[in-house]
């Protein structure tokens, strides 16, 4: 079992043990985001945010093995990831948690339009996991969120396994969110970041996306 999945199950079970008044219904009300996808929006100066969220009840009970969904992907529009998360929390009447976020995927159009408005909230807000992987997607980030891997139950678990295997080859830019943010700051908006290409059931991680003056240029 992937270490991320073990940690997630441990965290969920710990909540029940440490807070005896909690039950499964209360755990279901806490949404732990695994993957964030960011695309452009039809609304001016706003983005579409996609959140991949493990379904706690399915994972703990093991019902996912019988064909039940273990992950839900929900989307919302906002001026920033914080605004988008807030809008979604109000819509679903659930709280979103990003401490266990594993991957951030930025769509090609969003990256070409400029990264400052995307990354500034990630710099200011400490709840976002700085050890998350980050990549620029060829096309829409939504395509990554729609993949249906047959090798793993959780998309975030699948992405972690791909990063781990590709990392051994040295064929991509290996850096986490914290490295990416520090690199942009120290290089005045210029850096390299890994590139990801989605298919229906898998993703290909390889090569580098070139960021210049906070915009994707190649």
Model-derived segments and their meaning:
Residues 2-218:
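Membrane-proximal alpha-helical signals and transmembrane carboxylates
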């Amino acid at each position: 079992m992937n270490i991320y999945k073990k940690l997630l199950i441990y965290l969920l079970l710990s909540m029940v043990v440490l807070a005896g008044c909690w039950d499964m219904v209360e755990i279901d009300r806490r949404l732990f985001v695994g993957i964030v996808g960011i695309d452009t929006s039809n609304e001016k100066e706003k983005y579409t945010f996609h959140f991949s969220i493990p379904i706690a009840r399915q994972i703990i009970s093991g019902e996912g093995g019988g064909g039940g969904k273990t992950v839900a992907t929900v989307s919302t529009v906002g001026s920033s990831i914080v605004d988008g998360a807030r809008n979604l929390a109000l819509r679903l009447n659930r709280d979103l948690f990003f401490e266990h976020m594993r991957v951030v995927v930025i769509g090609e159009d969003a990256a070409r339009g400029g990264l400052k408005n995307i990354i500034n909230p990630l710099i200011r807000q400490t709840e976002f996991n700085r050890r998350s992987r980050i990549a620029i997607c060829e096309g829409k980030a939504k395509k990554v969120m729609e993949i249906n891997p047959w090798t793993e139950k959780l998309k975030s678990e699948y992405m972690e396994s791909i990063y781990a295997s590709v990392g051994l080859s040295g064929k991509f830019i290996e850096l986490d969110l914290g490295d990416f943010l520090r690199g942009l700051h120290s290089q005045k908006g210029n850096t390299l970041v890994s590139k990801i290409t989605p298919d229906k059931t898998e993703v290909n991680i390889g090569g580098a996306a070139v960021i210049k003056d906070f915009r994707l240029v190649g």
